[in-house]
Design a protein with these regions (language model features):
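Long protein-protein interaction modules used by eukaryotic assembly/scaffold proteins
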Residues: 1-37, 45, 49-176
């Protein structure tokens, strides 16, 4: 997630990131304390909801800072195997899961080659689709889906942990 919105697409300058090893890859991780704090809170809540099987999808939206127009929409569609309880062992080896995550990260990084250049300063937003009965933190707010009219879409690789299957896709404004 941090790779998409901030570093790879230039939403934040490269100077605001540090190179760190994660999932066996060198990744750009935010050095900005405000951004790190914000993402830390979101990711903590997301992890809780994922563990409970309450997440349907995560969407990273990149929008024009001045126009507010959605330019890219990165969708991570989550299917949870509800028959596997939180205390049950997962049959899939961690090495295999890590390999699939590496493949997705590489594909996201490579997508910069076919996505249109972002011609204006941009911001990002995170949309988390959950089950209807989930308690949402008070600081969070409802949002429209921020769809893109006349978009092109590219389906990226999927990965599975045996508990979760994640399908990935990016849609982007075709006529930028």
């Amino acid at each position: 997630m941090r790779v998409i919105g901030a570093a790879q697409r230039g939403v934040y300058p490269a100077s605001e990131f540090e190179h760190k090893q994660k999932y066996g890859l060198t990744m750009m991780v935010s050095a900005d304390s405000g951004l790190t704090s914000y993402l830390g809170g979101v990711l903590k809540q997301l992890a809780e909801w994922l563990a409970a099987g309450n997440v349907q999808k995560l969407v990273v939206v990149i929008a024009g800072q001045d126009s507010g127009e959605t330019l890219e929409r990165w969708v991570f569609d989550v299917q949870t195997d509800k028959s596997i309880g939180p205390d049950q062992a997962v049959e899939k080896p961690q090495k295999e899961i890590t390999s699939e995550i590496q493949a997705i990260i590489r594909q996201i990084t490579a997508s910069v080659t076919f996505l249109p250049l972002l011609e204006e300063p941009c911001t990002f937003d995170l949309l988390v689709y959950t089950d209807a009965d989930v308690d949402v933190p008070k600081a969070w707010e409802e949002s429209d889906p921020k769809y893109i009219a006349s978009s092109d879409e590219v389906k990226l690789r999927s990965f599975t942990t045996k508990v979760h299957k994640v399908d990935t896709m990016v849609s982007y404004k075709a006529d930028m």
